[in-house]
Amino acid sequence: MGKYFGTDGVRGVANTQLTPELAFKIGRVGGYVLTRHKQEGKPKVVIGRDTRISGQMLENALLAGLLSVGAEVVRLGVISTSGVAYLTRALGADAGVMISASHNPFPDNGIKFFGSNGFKLSDEVEAEVEQYLDAAEDTMPRPTGEQIGTVLEFLEGGQKYLSHLKSTVSERFDGLKVVLDCANGAVSSLAARLFADVDAEVITIGANPNGININDQCGSTHPERLVEEVLKHKADLGLSFDGDADRCIAVDNNGEIIDGDYIMAICARALKAKGKLNNNTVVTTVMANMGFFKGMEECSINTTKTAVGDRYVVEEMLRGGYNLGGEQSGHIVFLDYNTTGDGLLTGLQLLNIIKESGKPLSELKQVMVKYPQLLINVRVEDKSKLNGNEAIAQAIREVEEDLAGNGRVLVRPSGTEPIVRVMAEGPDAAQLEGLVNRIVDVVKQQLV
């Protein structure tokens, strides 16, 4: 991670950390670095945002920066991160930009870029952007006259994206009832339209954004209300998205939460059965539950692990020629259809598997059995001090000895927040609480 870029773009509290002035610079630098190869005509950049109150402020600042380097900007309005990634490619743009802080609370916001291929930027490109941001002098071009950039409104982009999603499934979903929790975020209007268009019976919650209620006790990080609604309506499936809808957490017909590990396992087995799982492999991260790996082994499906972050999952998928990967948090990547985690696409594929198999999600999830897992987030002053802290390392070693090879411990800094995550897995849920809290106590002593 760099000075500005975390694992998912630039983030901070809008108007204090992520200011309009910084957004202008990011637009100017990002627009230049990503489009300077353009030989003829103005470079094209698409831009979308979620529903945060600060989105319009940052969008206009970004726009000014992009226009100042001569870009033609296609404004999509409120749309998902995955919609921006798809439309960057579909519209032949040179770059894409999404304004969102994903699952973070509404005062935060963020900016992430996509290259012309729809993929997130590499560490190397982000490092170059940071060099320009920190340069003592702005040496980038300042076109004048007719070479100054222009803005094109393309609010039909959302419908174009939905048409693409519908083309990825062959089934119609009449007879299936789905509850959608839109997190008062980017797909508050798109999600219901998509699932109604494929004939599912749709019930929506968290679909009334007001600028400050995004992710507020709703969405993929708060699935409790979705569980209640699925049981209340006797639905076949519940789908919960985060603020920018690049992730999806499901709820089965019995009201049980189905996280990204389960979703990947279900989709991997379904793709393998059709002969469509590239290289018989699914890509996940170090956060995946031990039960996921055991379940895949029993299905004779290979797995490979990366660092946390869907960008690293995608890099490994491209390297190995794989088409399915994701994270426990619900970022699921179907590389045949999109270049990043896509909550709407994930939900649609799950519904398609339910319809094709004739089996409820509660039965499909039996492809794996989760090991008990406990995760505690500790808010700290400086997460960078985790590395090299001997007291914390010693606490981890002692807990690993207590698990005696029948479990695991993972302690890592968040890529997007001032948080250290302490996670342990093992066969005994009661034992885990004591083990994790031993490490948490040391983290608090050392870093808080």
Swiss-Prot record:
The active site is at 102 (phosphoserine intermediate). The keyword Magnesium applies. One of its GO terms (biological process) is UDP-N-acetylglucosamine biosynthetic process. Keywords: Isomerase, Magnesium, Metal-binding, Phosphoprotein. InterPro entries: A-D-PHexomutase_a/b/a-I, A-D-PHexomutase_a/b/a-I/II/III, A-D-PHexomutase_a/b/a-II, A-D-PHexomutase_a/b/a-III, A-D-PHexomutase_C, A-D-PHexomutase_C_sf, A-D-PHexomutase_CS, Alpha-D-phosphohexomutase_SF. Its EC number is 5.4.2.10. It catalyses: alpha-D-glucosamine 1-phosphate = D-glucosamine 6-phosphate. Binds 1 Mg(2+) ion per subunit. Its cofactor is Mg(2+). One of its GO terms (molecular function) is magnesium ion binding. Mg(2+) binds at residues 102, 242, 244, 246. The modification Phosphoserine is found at residue 102. One of its GO terms (cellular component) is cytosol. Pfam families: PGM_PMM_I, PGM_PMM_II, PGM_PMM_III, PGM_PMM_IV. The keyword Methyltransferase does not apply. Activated by phosphorylation. Catalyzes the conversion of glucosamine-6-phosphate to glucosamine-1-phosphate. Belongs to the phosphohexose mutase family. PANTHER family: PHOSPHOGLUCOMUTASE (ALPHA-D-GLUCOSE-1,6-BISPHOSPHATE-DEPENDENT), PHOSPHOHEXOSE MUTASE. HAMAP family: GlmM_B. This is Phosphoglucosamine mutase.
